[in-house]
Amino acid sequence: MSGKIKVTFIINDGEEKTVEAPIGLSILEIAHSNDLDLEGACEGSLACATCHVILEEEFYNKLKKPTEAEEDMLDLAFGLTDTSRLGCQIILTEELDGIKVRIPATTRNIKL
């Protein structure tokens, strides 16, 4: 493998955008580098929930469990689901090749 995997972002209107993403970066970093609207107000420091994304169960189950700090932030996310995670906490690995990431229509910055 060349050190890249395919990541498909599903935007709120159902539009899909598939990109090749380097292993080792976060979903938040990949979204930003591809001009996708995933806020990340705290720049990945686990101090907000604006990079909230929803994963398919298959890929959600391949990730390590969220830390307590991530769970605390997820509790504040708008539209939380059973497969919600913070994009800043999902680091790409070969095992995540083909992952689909839904970007919810709205996010909530708790600092507002």
Curated annotation (Swiss-Prot):
Keywords recorded for this protein, A-Z: 2Fe-2S, Electron transport, Iron, Iron-sulfur, Metal-binding, Transport
Keyword Transferase tagged: no
GO terms of biological process kind: P450-containing electron transport chain
Domain of life, source organism: Bacteria
Cofactor note: Binds 1 [2Fe-2S] cluster.
Family according to the record: Belongs to the adrenodoxin/putidaredoxin family.
Name of this chain's protein: 2Fe-2S ferredoxin
Organism of origin: Rickettsia conorii (strain ATCC VR-613 / Malish 7)
